[in-house]
């Protein structure tokens, strides 16, 4: 019996399982945030924007967990932005929060693509956005990126 190989295999299998669980949890969280955002958006149309504050208080009380107005507003904005797609589920919530202020879909798609291709951290993505990397691309390059989609 080769104990080393069994130990190594056990550790590798555990790492694979953790990665799968992390991805699944992230995707589940994002789907939940999207669905909550959709409901908040619809509720806002019926009851006004003050409903977010009311729901924040109720959720915090009922679930014994703080659901701030800001967090719920981000969820609503996340839904309304339309940037959540199954493939993009590979990004974390903190990545999405960096993308929410952007309004141009081509710009958003550019930053999503570079984040996925380069495995950028939230901080690295933020730096690229702040440096206006997309805006510094020439029009010809931007056109190619759009056509490539």
What are these regions (language model features)?
Residues 1-149:
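Basic, low-complexity intrinsically disordered segments
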């Amino acid at each position: 019996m080769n104990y080393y190989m069994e130990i190594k295999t056990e550790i590798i299998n555990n790492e694979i399982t953790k990665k799968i669980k992390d991805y699944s949890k992230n995707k589940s969280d994002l789907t939940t945030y999207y669905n909550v955002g959709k409901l908040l958006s619809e509720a806002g149309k019926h009851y006004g924007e003050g409903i977010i504050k009311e729901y924040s208080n109720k959720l915090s009380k009922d679930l014994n967990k703080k659901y701030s107005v800001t967090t719920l507003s981000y969820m609503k904005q996340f839904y309304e932005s339309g940037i959540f797609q199954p493939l993009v589920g590979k990004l974390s919530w903190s990545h999405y929060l960096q993308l929410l202020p952007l309004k141009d879909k081509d710009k958003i798609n550019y930053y999503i693509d570079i984040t996925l291709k380069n495995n950028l951290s939230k901080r690295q993505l933020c730096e690229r956005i702040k440096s206006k990397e997309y805006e510094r691309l020439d029009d010809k390059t931007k056109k190619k990126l759009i056509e490539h989609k």
